[in-house]
Amino acid sequence: MKKIIFMGTPSYATCILKALVENENFKLVALFTQPDKAVGRKQILTPSDTKAFLSQNYPSIPIFTPSSLKDKNIIREIKDLNPDFIVVAAYGKILPKAILDLAPCVNLHASLLPKYRGASPIQSAILNKDEKSGVCTMLMEEGLDTGAILESLECDIKDKNSSEVFELLANLAAKIILSTLLNFDKITPKKQEESLATLCRKIKKEDGLINLQNARELYQKYLAFTPWPGVFLENGLKFLELELVDELKQNAKMGEILELEKESFLLACKQGVLRIKKLQESGKKALDGRTYLNGKRLKSEDSLC
């Protein structure tokens, strides 16, 4: 039975953690995750998704929430646990060489590397209109997502939002990690092709700001930034649900309401047309498109904003 230290934080990582802890070939000896965070208006101290899952279902397994992995005491703790593998998935911290040298460190990355190294591979794939994405297992080294690839699985992501793709890739990751660890000695690591490498940065709230220039670009942002940070106009109006109707139409005025439907409306961009199904003004409740227009006394051929 192989001893595993798992390092991960969000729900994506929990799916992988669950697969490992339930498999009879592995013994989870510890979880490392981010410290509890203050959440919401009341700033309630909340554990990470992985910590909540493990403490509720496997309370005897130790959980570590260090602020730094460079602490000598933390490195000693890991060494004393004597793991056969350290598995890392969306942990949120860089592993120092002192830890990388203790055991094979296998990272699960939510892209088909070397594309989209970094913090937002799923959102970046959607923004770039990729129809395929996937998950890789790789041997970790000191560079950012630069290690040799062990295995990969791909899936179709066309017209799926980030939340849906996260779920798809989490399920793939839960499968591939078992395969990689069980067949580790038989796998020949494959170096990444550096000339094909691309980087992606962490998503910020302001990335959700949109204009009505291009319907296709706005739609891809909507998919990429659902559920967070969402998409919103400069005046704070949020588009919560929308569909791409036409990406080429150019003979209407930007921002013009083209047609009212039962619970939605068609909105002209400078190029293309969107169906707005649900929207929300800052500080107010969400409304379907038709109800919102009725409340504002807006009709066909009026400007939304």
Curated annotation (Swiss-Prot):
InterPro entries: Fmt, Formyl_trans_C, Formyl_transf_N, Formyl_transf_N_sf, Formyl_transferase-like_C_sf, GART_AS, Met-tRNA-FMT_C, Met-tRNA-FMT_N. It comes from the Bacteria. The keyword Transferase applies. It is an enzyme of class 2 (transferase). Coiled coil: none annotated. It catalyses: L-methionyl-tRNA(fMet) + (6R)-10-formyltetrahydrofolate = N-formyl-L-methionyl-tRNA(fMet) + (6S)-5,6,7,8-tetrahydrofolate + H(+). PROSITE patterns: GART. (6S)-5,6,7,8-tetrahydrofolate binds at residues 111-114. Keywords: Protein biosynthesis, Transferase. One of its GO terms (cellular component) is cytosol. Its EC number is 2.1.2.9. Pfam families: Formyl_trans_C (PF02911), Formyl_trans_N (PF00551). One of its GO terms (molecular function) is methionyl-tRNA formyltransferase activity. CDD domains: FMT_core_Met-tRNA-FMT_N, Met_tRNA_FMT_C. Attaches a formyl group to the free amino group of methionyl-tRNA(fMet). The formyl group appears to play a dual role in the initiator identity of N-formylmethionyl-tRNA by promoting its recognition by IF2 and preventing the misappropriation of this tRNA by the elongation apparatus. Belongs to the Fmt family. PANTHER family: METHIONYL-TRNA FORMYLTRANSFERASE, METHIONYL-TRNA FORMYLTRANSFERASE, MITOCHONDRIAL. This is Methionyl-tRNA formyltransferase. It comes from Campylobacter jejuni subsp. jejuni serotype O:2 (strain ATCC 700819 / NCTC 11168). The gene is fmt.
